[in-house]
């Protein structure tokens, strides 16, 4: 509560202080005998001391200035600037600290500082907020009139009169009389209307006599009558604020729209200009101490948006100021009520500018005990105009008429509620027909004007002519009626227990499972497709090569690094670019790039590819394999017609890594501009929307990774791109493409390309097991091998050292120091390979501490980081790069002179590719490998690579090789297979099968192509899997006879399930001892048969005396966590309880996927729904199934959006 004295806090509503703050001098003018003597500690100054002779002249001069401004004050609103001028000149003699307080309060208190004490006695005797407001308002106007006798004991000096005040006063009185006549006519019309409502008067009077309550409504004063001092008398009628609002407002011609402004009559505007505009009504923020303390009626006003909070206390009458339209004040007097009357709590009130609030309607059955509180809730609230509230009798008659209309409306709604079909057709809501009166009593409606039909509803009802028009214009919020869920569990109007059918649960679980599965593309039937013919053969052998004999061709291949070919009709290798049959534009680009002569692989591969043959090319790293398949592709594409709208690419290049795809795309760019071609690089990690936009614009060449290509083919139902025009396919690093998880994706893409395509495979390594797999997608291929299938280039110096783990980092620093100590290697690059992502980040941190600028790259980083890191490394921004094997293929850096295998590679091909990052295009390089004593398994492949490249194997490495081979002979170790396939396609197949079985058990995917064993297993456990998805509603008696645990019997797979009552002990049980023994034995067998098993419809503890008449169970153990949370959190359960009146209990224990409860253990987590009617249980189950569906779909969606995690930790 606000403090007394010179506090800055405003006075509370209803206090005897003015709502505006006073200066200290004004407060001192009051005598100590006034009612609010809380400031009695201040000294009082009499008028004689205040207006003594020495300052009387100045006072009169100031009054004359006030009189000169009276005309402006009457015609226009008060101007704060004018008041500030006059008030600033008048200062209190008190120079205390309240000067700031006095200055700040002047904008909020417009009472003139020149008024005398003429009305002081009147304010002292009459504590009415309305009279105090009017006396302050008319203080300055009556200052110049003849002085009146005062009730105060001390006289004051009379003020000079102004000649124009009488005329203005007469004019205002004339306007007032005209306004009164208009209001009198309005009241007579309302009385005639109220007379028609006399039928309900007797009923309501009888209710009033029974209740013994007499709430009173004060008649609002005429806002422009300053002399009215009558206190309204209470009446013995119902307090109906709706009727007050309706009577106070002008006769409505159109429905009032919430939030619009209400026009103020001209007479009200005239009086508003001279009334108090800053008499604030402070909202009472004190909460009720108990239910019998107070009730609140919030009366919002329109233009000035001040919320009046009228508080009705049980012990005293507190008077409040209600501001509205600046028309003065209104007295609201409330009669005393008994302390037993309960009040209606409306919660925390939030007052907002230019917003009207609506309050809920209390339950109707409480009307006898709480008549005043029920009527205090504003049910149908129009915009308020506080001009005239009428007399008490008129208000009472209007209240009774409104109550009669409300009674008729509720009766008609109760009749409609009895018809279930009509209710379903009109609103689609589920009616609780068992307790219609209770449902209606809990209904809370918020309408703008209940008795008036909304124009839109009326128009729609005229069109339909089947449903009666709804008499609501605002939003309706009901407790008893909950929105009917969508008809996803059977027929829309079916009310039986088909709510938990099999097919619908399978539908949304299948949707969730589909979201988790990878995108799939359909298999194309090539026999039904009509493909355009295309030409493969573009190569014409030059005459000098045609005259060459086979012996001369073999000698030439031997000179070109020992080219080995295998196949039928292999073309002879070319010696110059001009012999390849290329176009002028291509030759110009080759010349600009500085390619003088073809490399070994290029001289043999280009003629073979341009002859239209499938080719397998194996060559050492850095030998120019990329140009070997790009140049024939450009010639191949240029021979075909241009692309049309929505046609896919002609050339498709697939790579295993994103970095390699980026590098191939970069190598294409010099040729694209010259040949007027377009290429798109599509790889994972980059935004797919950009790649889709480029593909829709059209591209003859697509460089991609297999996973992203499948995504693009499946995007937008295959409308983004297609493979119908693909005739040239390249698999770069082909051994890796057919390894591990790449093989299914690659074969899926290859199956959708026309069979007569031309396929080219290139790699630096090609194990024999991968070779057999790759040949399945080729047709009579030519195999070209240059320098061995898995051989390190002879330009690379290989160093292998056997070291302990703790000495490797020191040795690495020594190698880097030796490299950069030579000025010639100032621009050299160093690439360090590790085996794990964590090791890459750890080594990065250690090298940074030692002063080496470096970066790391691995599969756990974002693609944009990987791309920028490689670009910076090539540009020389940092000289050292730490990487996993993700950078072992395709990375081409010309200044790379040192490769360090900090962690030894685990097979030969990985070692060849790592070492091949240096010594490219004829340059020299160094590859250093660290081996530890525990890595003797890897020493075999490293020694083999050294021997194949013609280098000596170090003695410590040879000892490790011999030791490992002896262990293999003794059976203690197993020799590792060559190639990346060492991790095993079989292992991945087993993991995929295991994941598929888990999904099948959990979600019942029902995938096709299952083997016989899976089919038999599915047939044996069909009922058990069905019970994991949805619960059935089944009686305890019927379920007790189930002989086999875990396999419920009597379940209709068509979804027609019946709800039975919970088993009750029969009243007239037989007293035969043998019957009792037999019943006990049967009960024991039934309990033993279901020990630890949760079957649908049979909760273990549903036999108690408090068990509902009907029940159902819903197992949620195997659903995702989000789905379980959706049906068990307090908020959702509370909503279902309020809507259906059932009891919902979470029972059982949670078991992870694949784990079943043992004997004597709790069943799996489930929900027990109990209710007194079948309809209540059904509605609760439908809502729970809906929440379960939403949670399952949300969990699947979040899993699909989750980023792929890596094997490293952010430090």
Swiss-Prot record:
CDD domains attached to this UniProt entry: DEADc_DDX46, KH-I_PRP5_like, SF2_C_DEAD
Record domain Helicase C-terminal: where: 811-961
Domain notes: The Q motif is unique to and characteristic of the DEAD box family of RNA helicases and controls ATP binding and hydrolysis.
Domain Helicase ATP-binding: 606-784
Motif (Q motif): 575-603
PANTHER family: ATP-DEPENDENT RNA HELICASE DBP3 (PTHR47958)
Known role: ATP-dependent RNA helicase involved spliceosome assembly and in nuclear splicing. Catalyzes an ATP-dependent conformational change of U2 snRNP. Bridges U1 and U2 snRNPs and enables stable U2 snRNP association with intron RNA.
Organism: Aspergillus fumigatus (strain ATCC MYA-4609 / CBS 101355 / FGSC A1100 / Af293)
GO biological process: mRNA splicing, via spliceosome
Acidic residues bias locations: 377-395
Renumbered residue ranges of the record's region Disordered: 1-240, 344-429, 975-1023
GO cellular component: nucleus
Compartments where found: Nucleus
Reactions listed under catalytic activity: ATP + H2O = ADP + phosphate + H(+)
Name of the featured protein: Pre-mRNA-processing ATP-dependent RNA helicase prp5
Motif window: DEAD box: 732-735
SUPFAM superfamilies for this protein: P-loop containing nucleoside triphosphate hydrolases (SSF52540)
Family: Belongs to the DEAD box helicase family. DDX46/PRP5 subfamily.
Basic and acidic residues biased stretches: 24-87, 94-153, 165-193, 402-411, 984-1007
């Amino acid at each position: 509560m606000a403090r007394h004295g010179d506090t800055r806090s405003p006075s509370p509503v209803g206090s005897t202080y003015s709502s505006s703050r006073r200066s200290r001098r004004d407060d001192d003018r009051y005598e100590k005998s006034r009612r609010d003597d809380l400031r009695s500690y201040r000294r009082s100054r009499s008028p004689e001391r205040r207006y003594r002779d020495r300052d009387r002249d100045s006072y009169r001069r100031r009054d004359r200035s006030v009189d000169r401004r009276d005309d402006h004050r009457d015609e226009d609103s008060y101007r704060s600037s004018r008041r500030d001028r006059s008030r600033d000149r008048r200062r209190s003699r008190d120079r205390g600290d309240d000067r700031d307080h006095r200055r700040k309060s002047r904008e909020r208190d417009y009472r003139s500082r020149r008024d005398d004490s003429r009305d002081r006695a009147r304010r002292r005797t009459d504590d009415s907020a309305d009279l105090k407001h009017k006396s302050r308002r008319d203080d300055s106007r009556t200052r110049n009139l003849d002085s009146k006798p005062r009730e105060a004991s001390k006289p004051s000096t009379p003020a000079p009169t102004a000649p124009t005040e009488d005329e203005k006063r007469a004019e205002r009185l004339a306007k007032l009389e005209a306004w009164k006549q208009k209001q009198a006519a309005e009241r007579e019309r309302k009385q005639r209307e109220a007379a028609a409502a006399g039928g309900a008067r007797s009923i309501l009077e009888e209710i009033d006599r029974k209740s013994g309550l007499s709430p009173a409504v004060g008649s609002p004063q005429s806002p422009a009558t300053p002399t009215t001092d009558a206190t309204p008398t209470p009446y013995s009628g119902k307090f109906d604020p709706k009727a007050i609002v309706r009577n106070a407002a002008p006769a409505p011609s159109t429905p009032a729209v919430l939030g619009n402004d209400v026009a103020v009559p001209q007479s009200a505007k005239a009086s508003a200009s001279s009334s108090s505009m800053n008499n604030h009504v402070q909202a009472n923020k004190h909460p009720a101490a108990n239910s019998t303390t107070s009730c609140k009626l919030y009366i919002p006003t329109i233009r000035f948006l001040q919320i009046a909070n009228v508080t009705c206390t049980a012990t005293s009458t507190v008077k409040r100021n209600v501001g509205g339209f600046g028309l003065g004040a209104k007295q609201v007097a409330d009669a005393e009520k008994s302390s037993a009357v309960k009040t209606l709590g409306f919660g925390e009130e939030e007052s907002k500018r230019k917003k009207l609030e609506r309050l809920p309607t209390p339950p109707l059955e409480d009307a006898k005990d709480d008549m005043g509180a029920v009527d205090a809730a504003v049910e149908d609230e129009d915009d308020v105009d506080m001009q005239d509230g009428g007399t008490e009798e008129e208000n009472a008659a209007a209240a009774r008429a409104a109550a009669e209309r409300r009674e008729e409306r509720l009766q008609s709604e109760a009749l409609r509620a009895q018809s279930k079909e009509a209710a379903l057709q009109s609103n689609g809501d589920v009616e609780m027909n068992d307790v219609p009166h209770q449902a209606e009593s809990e209904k809370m409606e918020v309408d703008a004007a209940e008795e008036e039909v909304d124009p839109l509803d009326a128009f729609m009802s005229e069109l339909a002519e089947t449903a009666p028009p709804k008499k609501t214009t605002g939003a309706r919020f009901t407790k008893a009626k909950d929105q009917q869920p969508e008809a996803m569990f059977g027929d829309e109007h079916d009310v039986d227990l088909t709510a938990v059918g099999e097919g619908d649960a399978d539908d949304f679980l299948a949707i969730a499972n589909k979201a988790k599965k990878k995108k799939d593309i359909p298999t194309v039937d090539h026999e039904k497709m009509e493909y355009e013919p295309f030409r493969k053969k573009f190569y014409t052998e030059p005459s000098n090569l045609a005259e060459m004999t086979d012996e001369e061709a073999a000698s030439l291949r031997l000179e070109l690094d020992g080219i080995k070919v295998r196949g039928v009709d292999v073309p002879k290798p070319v010696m110059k670019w001009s012999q390849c049959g290329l176009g002028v534009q291509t030759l110009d680009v080759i010349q600009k790039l500085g390619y003088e002569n073809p490399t070994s692989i290029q001289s043999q591969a280009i003629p073979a590819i341009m002859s239209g043959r499938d080719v397998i090319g194996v060559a050492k790293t850095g030998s120019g394999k990329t140009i070997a398949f790009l140049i024939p592709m450009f010639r191949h594409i240029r021979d075909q017609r241009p692309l049309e709208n929505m046609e896919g690419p002609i050339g498709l290049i697939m790579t295993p890594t994103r970095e390699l795809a980026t590098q191939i795309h970069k190598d294409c760019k010099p040729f694209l501009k010259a040949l007027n071609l377009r290429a798109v690089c599509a790889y994972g990690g980059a935004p797919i929307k950009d790649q889709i936009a480029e593909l829709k614009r059209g591209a003859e060449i697509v460089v991609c990774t297999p996973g992203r290509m499948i995504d693009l083919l499946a995007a937008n139902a295959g409308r983004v791109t297609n493979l119908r025009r693909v005739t040239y396919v390249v698999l770069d690093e082909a051994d890796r493409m057919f390894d591990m998880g790449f093989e299914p994706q690659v074969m899926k893409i290859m199956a959708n390309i026309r069979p007569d395509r031309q396929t080219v495979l290139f790699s630096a390594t090609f194990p024999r097991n991968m070779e057999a797999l790759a040949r399945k997608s080729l047709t009579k291929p030519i195999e070209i091998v240059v320098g061995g299938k898995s051989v390190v280039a002879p330009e690379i110096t290989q160093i292998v050292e056997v070291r302990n783990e703790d000495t490797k980092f020191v040795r690495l620093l020594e190698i880097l120091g030796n490299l950069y100590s030579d000025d010639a290697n100032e621009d050299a690059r160093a690439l360090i390979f590790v085996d794990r992502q964590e090791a890459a980040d750890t080594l990065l941190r250690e090298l940074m501490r030692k002063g080496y600028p470096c970066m790391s790259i691995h599969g756990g980083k974002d693609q944009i980081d990987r791309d920028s890191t490689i670009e910076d490394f090539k540009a020389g921004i940092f000289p050292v790069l730490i990487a996993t094997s993700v950078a072992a293929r395709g990375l081409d850096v010309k200044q790379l002179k040192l490769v360090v295998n900090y962690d030894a590679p685990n097979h030969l091909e990985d070692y060849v590719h790592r070492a091949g990052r240096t010594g490219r295009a004829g340059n020299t390089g160094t590859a250093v490998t660290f081996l530890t004593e525990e890595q003797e398994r890897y020493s075999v492949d490293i020694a083999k690579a050294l021997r194949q490249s013609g280098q000596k194997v170090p003695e410590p490495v040879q000892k490790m090789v011999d030791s490992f081979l002896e262990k293999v002979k003794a059976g203690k170790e197993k020799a590792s297979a060559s190639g990346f396939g060492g991790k095993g396609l079989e292992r991945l197949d087993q993991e995929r099968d295991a994941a598929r079985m888990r999904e099948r058990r959990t979600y019942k995917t029902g995938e096709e192509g299952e083997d016989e064993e899976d089919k038999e297993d599915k047939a044996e456990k069909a009922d058990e899997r069905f019970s994991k998805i949805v619960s059935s509603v089944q009686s305890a008696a019927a379920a007790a006879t189930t002989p086999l645990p875990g396999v419920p019997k009597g379940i209709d797979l068509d979804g027609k399930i019946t709800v039975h009552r919970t088993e009750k002990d029969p009243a007239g049980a037989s007293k035969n001892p043998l019957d009792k023994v037999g019943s006990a034995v049967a009960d024991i067998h039934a309990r033993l048969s279901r020990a630890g098993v949760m079957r649908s419809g049979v909760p273990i503890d549903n036999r108690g005396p408090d068990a509902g008449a009907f029940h159902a169970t819903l197992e949620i153990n195997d659903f995702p966590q989000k789905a379980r949370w959706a049906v068990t959190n307090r908020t959702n359960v509370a909503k279902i309880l309020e809507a259906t009146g059932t009891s919902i209990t979470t029972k059982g224990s949670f078991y992870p996927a694949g784990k079943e409860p043992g004997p004597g253990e709790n069943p799996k987590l489930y929900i027990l729904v109990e209710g007194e009617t079948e309809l209540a249980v059904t509605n609760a189950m439908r809502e729970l199934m809906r929440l379960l569906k939403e949670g399952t779909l949300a969990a699947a969606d979040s899993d699909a959006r989750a980023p792929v995690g890596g094997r490293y930790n952010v430090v």
